[in-house]
Amino acid sequence: KAVFDAYWGKWAEYRSSVGLVLSSHLQTQVALAKARHYENVLERELFQDNLPPAVYRTLVTEVNKALPTLHRYFKLRQRMLGLDQMHYYDIYPPLVALDKKFDIETTKAITLDAMEVLGDDWVKIQRDSFDERWMHVFPQQGKRSGAYMSGFAYDVHPYLLLNHNDDYESLSTFAHEWGHAIHTLYARQSQPFETANYATFIAEIPSTSLELILQNYMVNQAETIDEKLFYLGFGLEQMRGTFFRQTMFAEFELALYEAVERGEALSGDRITQMYGEIVRRYHGHDEGVVIVDDLYTNEWMFVPHFYFNMYVFQYATSVTAGTALYGKILEDQEAGSANYKDLLRAGGSDYPHLLLSRAGVDLTQPEPYQAVVTQMNAIMDQMERLLEERDQ
């Protein structure tokens, strides 16, 4: 609480200035969309990849319908942390501590074992790639933080930047970035230069799929109840942060553009009010699920993606598609993995929505989003059973 109050309290001092900057950006984008004869900014931003607006709007609609599942997660979190009342700052502490280290060699071995569900050819490509020294693995002075895969050169293999810290998050990040890398390899091997590069809308799907495969593997390999709870809780938190939080941002961003398109003038105070209404609805503030104090409604100022024009929704659609494709692998490992790899090999050979539809995932329809919600509820059912077993 002290950290949140100090951090967002300082941001609040700049609300008027940051509001002016964001409002100016929004007005510019609306003017550019009108000048180019688009109906609105959403239509303009989806045009390049020929994405139906129904993808964006169905995502927002289905996630709003699923808010009771998000609230169930918060109540489970409250129970596991032993809190009388959840506040916004209680979302981030880990549910269970894991005293386990994953050095880089262990990380490689676990990843190869977990990815056996994708077939021998996948494992061979990944194992051979490990031996080619494509990765800069460890943190060092002057190195940027985070993790990144670079695969821009058609005739050159991908490079991976990592900052491995021997923890489970580093292991999950390792799998994530190799999802990008092998996607790039498959696309380069199967497509000519002109159609090898894939759209952002597709890019995060392989990475999120590999995280799901890893998580399921780790749960099955866990030796204690607390270890299982850690992996399940880690996966739930990723779903919250990607499926719900990014959709919340997407809904907020759409509301901002629609307000400007109606001719409304947006100040820092008005933007904060709009964000506050959405963040409180998502977190069940009025129902007492998670209390979001006024100060924390300044959070919108912290998010750089609001200057990227309708970008964040793709994180949520990616985890949705990744969950659907992984579900097909679980149903029929051979056919599901072949279908998955066919999508990766397709690169940018067609519009991303059409490629996904051919892989059996139609994101204009409610079913893929509902499958994510079903998966979250199944994880929480499993966690509640484990908690009862542990507490006996």
Tell what function each PLM region has.
Residues 38-43, 85-87, 146-157, 177-189, ...:
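Active-site-adjacent bridging/hinge elements
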